[in-house]
């Protein structure tokens, strides 16, 4: 069932806001705060009985009593409203209170009938589903009042400014006083008891505006027209008309006071406290005018009322023959005047009965049979009841005609106001019909709130605890079933078999009820029978039941009506049964059964809201609370079971399709800019929406076809988010546009500042933070490890060079050569370290080593003096797959142990200042396969099969570093284990400060990391030629003339017919054509790799692009085909300057630049000193990281090969549009790239001196790896594994 909506938002189509209070200030219309607001009325009991700590009937009764005594008559059970009749005006239906419930969900306000109306109206608009409000309870519990308040609220909030819609609203409200006057009466239990049932359907257009209405009438208690018990009254209209009729009506229709008529005076109750018949009559006339009844129609209605009153005054006496005789002949004469018939016909119809005999289907003799006084009184009353009943039906039909919608309706809201359950001392056919309809309504409540709900949970496979309840279907079947025959069927059979004699028919019915004795809810007791209804046991009197069930007029009465000249009276009796028809006319029981089933069908097609009314006492006292009577009502209304189902169940459910359609805006995975983007099925989309909105998993369940939400608060939150979506989108657009206009210059400055400050080391910081995660707070830290400027630079010895695969500094190249690693092996980490070396018979000592980590192995290099020469050799190579664990102590020392599987040698014990960084790179290269052990005692293999331990202890006497002695390391206390790196020191702020406080832009670039742009490719345009190093200032070679340019120009000129223009004057010198640099291959370069250019010795090629990052590869062009070739295989062909075209003097050849000698150490580009612990080396340069991309065929989750220094690499792009080739970043990087390019050109020149004989194979230059990507840069490194 649909539940109402979001919190706080007003609805579209709102008429207007309520006017400000009297205390509103003149400034902006804001009401002044009132101290009284802090003293709110104390709440009695709980407003929602699902919150009761103990769910029993007695606890429910106690809670209702507390609230009733505190003038709080409304209480919730979930979305069901419980209303206790206060029998007084509490002042809670004013316009201000009505407006306070507008646009609010039921949890925001105290319980009220207006909240139910608001929920129904909102759900109709939001979900485009028909709604109905079912009001049930016993007579006098306040059902009619609740229905009036529902209509009052809907008319007030439903919007619509044109006159047609306002007319519909006025007519809907006018139906209440009009139908109350004709359909309600004062009873012992209720001063305004509905003696009929009505179902009002208000029809709305697509905008939620009322465009029409329709009323369905159910079973008017017409017997009340002629008979009432003591201290009850006839229908209100009789007292209103007799007391307040105009002089014209009194004169024309002979109207006197109510005491003058038998039908109004016999019960001896002419006046009622709290009822003003004069005022009510004026309201009735106003309602007639609003509905659109003409003056003639109103006169005819009052004429029929007067006729009924005068018919009641026809009194009988018994003549000598024992037949009925009218005591006052003037009365039937006046009745004849009012009905516009012959007076003799009236007398005959009221004292005689015409009987016809038939033989073989033919008409026989006609007899006039006189009636005795009892029979005559029955005929008189039958005429009065028929006129009033048909007139009431005509009024309802006339109302529907006036409210008939002029356009097509989209949805309806139905309000059911029907007579309550009745138990009297003498219960007859009317009570049977009324209680039957109430049983049907109770069955609907059970079907929708108890039975159907539990069946739906089972079908949808929802976790659920079954609740026991009483299903009254067995009682409904007892009354309405045909097979086995129920009470209505037994009545029909009795009427058919003994139709002439009512007493014989009643006896036949008593005999037939014996067949129902097997039903446990039925008990036959002579001339009476008992039915155990859901609301209690009722004893019914059989006498007169069959006659009331036939509900047929005598032929004499119908003939009298037919003879009338009043057209209105003719309209009241449109259909006359065909006497020749063999089909049995429908009985009253048939009609009420058909009406009840049609009502149930209509209600089942709508989404119901429930109002359960309770009568607090039988005396209509505003202060009396009859606990026993209310406890009985609580039980038969099933409030306890309703609370249990509500507490255990789900407040809202809907199909996946409708759920997605309603709430897809709330998830970025299912919508974009208001468009539905989900590609999966509706179930997965629904689940995604509920997950993305942050709803706790226990708050919802997914069924087979529907999604279930447990609490209404969750649904209200969803509705609130949905209502705010478009509002937030509009605000975001407005805010973004204002920010663009107001802060675009500041944004540019912030981007520049951020880029300058962070371009160098963002990735190094990320790697450093991952190192903290690796230690996981298990090891004390050194103070220098936590410095804000500390970065994990990786290749401190520059073994990997610019791309991590060679070409670094001289020392780095020497170390790489010493390891013997393959050309494509990328270096991730290199540093100086110390290895613990054991000595025979003495304690082990630390010995200096070089430590290199690649994507394949760990290399330990040692420098020794061999034959009086310093030699660096690879002491040990350990494959990464062989390392099982890395051991670290929990103190601040710098020792680590590499545990190697199945090694013949001892596990290396290393002392390295960058131990955390080394472990971090190890984990990245092995995808976290290496176990990191942190302990104060580390185990290692001293040799194969022999284990040893090295222990660590604190010693505050050790002032610096740590001390090793006899398998024990002593070290002082360090920083706490949970320490993290300190923030980098802030630079001194510039003179220009932003005008904002830093809230406009978020630090660190875009908020969504997924939106980070990919590096752009460098366009393949010919770069500016790099300067060549020489002994002095570097000179720039003049470009040679393009091959074939002259002939091409001649060819073009030859095709023209115009004469050649005259030559230029001799003094002018024409500019030379641009030359293309040509290079000659010094060696054979054989390759089959895609994108590479195979070269033979002495091949001449053109260089179209030189990689400025120093990777050693150039893009060359040979015979129109481009490809990559190593730059150290090429030599520049120096060409003489071409002869100027217009110069008369012979050309002057420019001498080729002097070939440089072999590059000496002084001529090499300066290499920054390697960082040493403690700052021993000065001028530490922080290089930029270049990470190797995943090779073809590699594992997709394999970590990047290395993060090493590269002074020539382009900056890493951290903001959109920066760091691209040719941009600001390229200008910054150009200076750093010049040295690498110059070194490559110098090497080519040196090789040119002896090109006649290629060097030995061993002397052939090593081919550098190709640039990664078209711009020579690799993709950014993946985030560290967490």
Swiss-Prot record:
SUPFAM superfamilies: P-loop containing nucleoside triphosphate hydrolases, SH3-domain. GO terms for molecular function: actin filament binding; Arp2/3 complex binding; ATP binding; hydrolase activity; microfilament motor activity. SMART domains: MYSc, SH3. It comes from Mycosarcoma maydis. Residues 44-723 form the Myosin motor domain. Residues 727-747, 748-773 form the IQ domain. Phosphorylation of the TEDS site (Ser-365) is required for the polarization of the actin cytoskeleton. Phosphorylation probably activates the myosin-I ATPase activity. Belongs to the TRAFAC class myosin-kinesin ATPase superfamily. Myosin family. Residues 412-494 are annotated as: Actin-binding. This is Myosin-1. PANTHER family: MYOSIN, MYOSIN-3-RELATED. The modification Phosphoserine is found at residue 365. Residues 1059-1068 have a biased composition (Pro residues). ATP binds at residues 137-144. The myosin motor domain displays actin-stimulated ATPase activity and generates a mechanochemical force. It is found in: Cytoplasm, Cytoskeleton, Actin patch. One of its GO terms (cellular component) is myosin I complex. GO terms for biological process: actin cortical patch assembly; actin cortical patch localization; actin filament organization; endocytosis; mitotic cytokinesis. Gene3D superfamilies: 1.10.10.820, 1.20.5.4820, 1.20.58.530, Kinesin motor domain, Myosin VI head, motor domain, U50 subdomain, SH3 Domains. Keywords: Actin-binding, ATP-binding, Cytoplasm, Cytoskeleton, Hydrolase, Motor protein, Myosin, Nucleotide-binding, Phosphoprotein, Repeat, SH3 domain. Residues 781-977 form the TH1 domain. Residues 1074-1135 form the SH3 domain. Type-I myosin implicated in the organization of the actin cytoskeleton. Required for proper actin cytoskeleton polarization. At the cell cortex, assembles in patch-like structures together with proteins from the actin-polymerizing machinery and promotes actin assembly. Functions as actin nucleation-promoting factor (NPF) for the Arp2/3 complex. Residues 1029-1058, 1252-1269 have a biased composition (Low complexity).
């Amino acid at each position: 069932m649909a539940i109402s909506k979001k919190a706080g938002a007003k609805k579209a189509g709102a008429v207007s806001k309520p006017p400000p209070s009297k205390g509103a200030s003149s400034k902006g219309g804001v009401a002044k705060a009132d101290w009284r607001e802090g003293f709110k009325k104390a709440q009695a009991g709980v407003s929602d009985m699902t919150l009761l700590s103990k769910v029993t009937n007695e606890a429910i009764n106690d809670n209702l009593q507390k609230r009733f005594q505190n003038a709080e008559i409304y209480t919730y059970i979930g979305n069901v409203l419980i209303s206790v009749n206060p029998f007084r005006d509490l002042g809670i239906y004013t316009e201000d209170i009505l407006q306070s419930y507008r646009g609010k969900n039921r949890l925001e306000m105290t319980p009220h009938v207006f909240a139910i109306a608001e929920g129904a109206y909102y759900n109709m608009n939001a979900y485009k589903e028909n709604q109905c409000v079912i009001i049930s309870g016993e007579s006098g519990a306040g059902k009619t009042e609740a229905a009036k308040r529902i209509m009052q609220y809907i008319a007030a909030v439903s919007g619509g400014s044109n006159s047609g819609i306002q007319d519909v609203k006025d007519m809907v409200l006018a139906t209440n006083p009009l139908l109350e006057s004709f359909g309600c009466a004062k009873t012992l239990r209720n001063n305004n008891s509905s003696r009929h049932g009505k179902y009002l359907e208000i029809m709305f257009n697509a905008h939620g505006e009322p465009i029409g209405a329709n009323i369905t009438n159910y079973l008017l208690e017409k017997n009340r027209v002629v008979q009432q018990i003591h201290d009850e009254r006839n229908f209100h209209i009789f007292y209103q008309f007799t007391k307040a009729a105009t002089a014209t009506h009194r004169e024309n229709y002979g109207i006197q006071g109510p005491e003058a008529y038998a039908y109004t005076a016999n019960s001896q109750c002419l006046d009622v406290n709290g009822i003003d018949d004069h005022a009510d009559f004026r309201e009735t006339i106003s309602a007639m005018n609003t509905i659109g009844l003409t003056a003639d129609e109103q006169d005819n209605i009052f004429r029929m009322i007067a006729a009924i009153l005068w018919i009641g005054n026809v009194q009988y006496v018994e003549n000598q023959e024992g037949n009925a005789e009218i005591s006052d002949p003037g009365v039937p004469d006046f009745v004849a005047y009012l009905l516009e018939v012959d007076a003799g016909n009236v007398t005959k119809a009221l004292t005689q009965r015409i009987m016809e005999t038939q033989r073989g289907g033919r008409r026989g003799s006609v007899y006039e049979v006189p009636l005795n006084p009892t029979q005559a009184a029955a005929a008189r009353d039958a005429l009065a009841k028929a006129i009033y009943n048909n007139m009431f039906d005509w009024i309802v039909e006339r109302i529907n005609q006036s409210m008939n919608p002029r356009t097509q309706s989209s949805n309806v809201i139905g309000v059911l106001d029907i007579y309550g359950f009745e138990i009297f001392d003498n219960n007859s056919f009317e009570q049977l019909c009324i209680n039957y309809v109430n049983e049907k309504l109770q069955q609907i409540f059970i079907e929708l709130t108890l039975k159907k709900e539990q069946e739906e949970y089972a079908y949808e496979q929802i976790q659920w605890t079954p609740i026991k309840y009483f299903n009254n279907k067995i009682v409904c079947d007892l009354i309405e079933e045909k097979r086995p025959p129920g009470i209505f069927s037994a009545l029909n059979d009795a009427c058919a078999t003994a139709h002439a004699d009512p007493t014989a028919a009643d006896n036949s019915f008593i005999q037939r009820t014996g067949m129902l004795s097997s039903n446990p809810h039925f008990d036959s007791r002579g001339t009476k029978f008992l039915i155990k209804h859901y609301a209690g046991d009722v004893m019914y009197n059989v006498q007169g039941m069959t006659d009331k069930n036939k509900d047929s007029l005598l032929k004499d009465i119908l003939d009298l009506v037919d003879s009338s000249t009043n057209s209105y009276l003719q309209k009241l009796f449109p259909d006359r049964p065909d006497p020749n028809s063999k089909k049995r006319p429908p009985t009253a029981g048939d009609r009420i059964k058909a009406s009840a089933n049609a009502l149930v069908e209509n209600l089942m097609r709508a989404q119901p809201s429930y109002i359960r009314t309770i009568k607090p006492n039988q005396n209509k006292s505003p202060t009396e609370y009859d606990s026993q009577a209310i406890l009985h009502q609580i039980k038969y209304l099933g409030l306890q079971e309703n609370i249990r189902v509500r507490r255990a169940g789900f407040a809202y459910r809907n199909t996946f399709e409708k759920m997605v359609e309603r709430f897809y805006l709330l998830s970025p995975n299912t919508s974009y800019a208001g468009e539905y983007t989900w590609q999966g099925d509706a179930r997965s989309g629904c689940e995604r929406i509920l997950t993305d909105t942050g709803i706790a998993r226990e708050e919802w369940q997914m069924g087979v076809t529907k999604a279930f939400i447990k609490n209404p608060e969750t649904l209200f939150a969803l509705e609130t988010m949905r209502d705010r979506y478009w509002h937030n989108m509009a605000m975001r657009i407005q805010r973004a546009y204002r920010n663009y206009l107001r802060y675009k210059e500041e944004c540019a400055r912030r981007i520049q500042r951020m880029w300058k400050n962070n371009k160098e080391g963002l990735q190094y910081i990320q790697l450093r933070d991952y190192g903290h995660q690796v230690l996981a707070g298990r090891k004390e830290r050194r103070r220098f490890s936590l410095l804000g400027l500390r970065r994990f630079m990786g290749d401190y010895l520059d073994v990997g060079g610019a791309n991590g695969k060679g070409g670094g500094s001289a020392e780095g190249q020497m170390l790489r050569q010493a390891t013997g690693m393959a050309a494509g092996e990328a270096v991730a980490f290199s540093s100086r370290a110390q290895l613990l070396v054991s000595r025979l018979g003495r304690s082990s000592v630390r010995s200096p080593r070089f430590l290199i980590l690649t994507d394949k192995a760990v290399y330990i290099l040692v420098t020794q003096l061999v034959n009086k020469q310093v030699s660096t050799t690879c002491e040990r190579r350990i494959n990464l797959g062989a390392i099982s664990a890395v051991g670290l102590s929990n103190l601040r020392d710098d020792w680590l142990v590499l545990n190697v599987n199945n090694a013949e040698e001892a596990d290396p014990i290393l002392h390295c200042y960058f131990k955390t960084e080394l472990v971090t790179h190890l984990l990245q290269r092995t995808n976290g396969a290496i176990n990191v052990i942190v302990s104060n005692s580390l185990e290692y293999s001293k040799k194969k099969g022999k284990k040893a331990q090295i222990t660590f202890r604190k010693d505050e006497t050790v002032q610096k570093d740590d001390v090793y002695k006899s398998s024990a390391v002593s070290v002082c206390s360090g920083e706490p284990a949970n320490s993290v790196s300190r923030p980098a020191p802030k630079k001194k702020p510039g003179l220009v400060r932003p005008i904002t406080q830093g809230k406009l832009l978020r630090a660190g670039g875009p908020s969504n990391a997924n939106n980070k742009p990919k590096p752009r490719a460098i366009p393949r345009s010919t770069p500016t030629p790099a300067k060549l190093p020489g002994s002095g200032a570097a000179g720039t070679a003049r470009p040679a003339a393009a091959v074939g340019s002259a002939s091409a120009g001649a060819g073009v000129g030859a095709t023209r017919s115009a004469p050649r223009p005259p030559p230029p004057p001799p003094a002018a010198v024409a500019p030379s054509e641009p030359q293309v640099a040509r290079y000659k291959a010094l060696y054979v370069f054989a390759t089959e790799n895609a994108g590479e250019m195979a070269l033979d010795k002495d091949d001449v090629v053109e260089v179209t692009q030189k990689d400025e990052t120093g990777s050693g590869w150039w893009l060359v062009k040979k015979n129109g085909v481009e490809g990559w070739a190593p730059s150290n295989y090429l030599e520049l062909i120096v060409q003489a300057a071409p002869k100027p075209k217009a110069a008369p003097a012979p050309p002057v050849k420019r001498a080729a630049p002097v070939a440089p000698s072999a590059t000496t150490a002084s001529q090499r580009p300066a290499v920054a000193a390697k960082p040493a612990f403690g700052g021993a080396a000065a001028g530490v340069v922080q290089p930029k990281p270049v990470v190797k991309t995943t090779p073809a065929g590699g594992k997709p989750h394999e970590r990047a090969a290395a993060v090493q220094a590269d002074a020539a690499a382009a900056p890493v792009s951290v903001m959109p549009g920066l760091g691209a080739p040719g941009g600001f970043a390229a200008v910054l990087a150009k200076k750093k790239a010049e040295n690498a390019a110059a070194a490559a050109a110098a090497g080519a020149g040196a090789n040119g001196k002896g090109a006649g004989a290629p060097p030995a194979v061993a002397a052939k230059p090593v081919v550098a790896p190709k640039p990664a990507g078209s711009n020579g840069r690799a993709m950014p490194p993946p985030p560290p594994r967490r």
